């Protein structure tokens, strides 16, 4: 079965559906690593990727954004010169009522009778002004981190902004 477009699950409607003990066969989230880079070093510059609208972010979108930032920063700065943390966890279970299509589908399917749906994936509920990612680095790689976070924002279903939360005077002096 083909994956449905993410725009079907973007809006937040109704309460969160998270009680996995009552469901059978919830697929695991694709994102498994939430903290990357050098966790021990104290970096002078910190930037945050902040959601500007409320939405649900699928686990595949979170993973794509994480991979994007990680790849760009490891190529530019190496593993020891940055820190990355993905903040939201995809708790909300997404359901889909599979519909039969093609010739003779009306004889096989029961239409919208018992249309509750089966679990097909997970999503994180992100509200307006929530932090999605936190990135830290030094002065030499601050510009790369800002570009990496902007590229990650493209992969998410909400408009985002990059905010410098630590080291504004350093970042301003180097032109970030």
Curated annotation (Swiss-Prot):
One GO MF term: structural constituent of ribosome
Keywords assigned by UniProt, alphabetized: Ribonucleoprotein, Ribosomal protein
PROSITE patterns linked to this entry: RIBOSOMAL_L10E
Stored Gene3D superfamilies: Ribosomal protein L10e/L16
InterPro entries: Ribosomal_uL16, Ribosomal_uL16_arc, Ribosomal_uL16_CS_euk_arc, Ribosomal_uL16_dom, Ribosomal_uL16_euk_arch, Ribosomal_uL16_sf
Pfam families, per database record: Ribosomal_L16 (PF00252)
GO cellular-component term (any): ribosome
GO terms of biological process kind: translation
UniProt-listed SUPFAM superfamilies: Ribosomal protein L16p/L10e
Top-rank lineage group of the source organism: Archaea
Assigned protein family: Belongs to the universal ribosomal protein uL16 family.
Name by which UniProt lists this protein: Large ribosomal subunit protein uL16
Organism: Thermoplasma volcanium (strain ATCC 51530 / DSM 4299 / JCM 9571 / NBRC 15438 / GSS1)
Recorded name of the encoding gene: rpl10e
């Amino acid at each position: 079965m083909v994956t449905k477009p993410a725009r079907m699950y973007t809006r937040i409607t109704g309460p969160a559906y998270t009680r996995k003990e009552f469901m059978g066969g919830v697929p695991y989230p694709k994102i498994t690593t939430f903290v990357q880079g050098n966790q021990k070093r104290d970096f002078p510059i910190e930037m945050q990727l902040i959601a500007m609208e409320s939405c649900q972010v699928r686990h595949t979108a979170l993973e794509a954004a994480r991979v994007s930032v990680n790849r760009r920063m490891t190529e530019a700065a190496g593993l020891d010169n940055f820190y990355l943390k993905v903040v939201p966890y995809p708790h909300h279970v997404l359901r889909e009522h599979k519909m039969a299509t093609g010739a003779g589908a009306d004889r096989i399917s029961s239409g919208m009778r018992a249309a509750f749906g089966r679990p097909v994936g997970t999503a994180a509920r992100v509200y307006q002004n929530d932090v999605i990612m936190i990135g830290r680095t030094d002065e030499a790689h601050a510009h790369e981190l800002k570009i990496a976070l902007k590229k990650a924002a493209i992969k998410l279903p909400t408009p985002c902004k990059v905010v410098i939360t630590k080291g504004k005077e350093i970042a301003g002096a180097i032109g970030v």
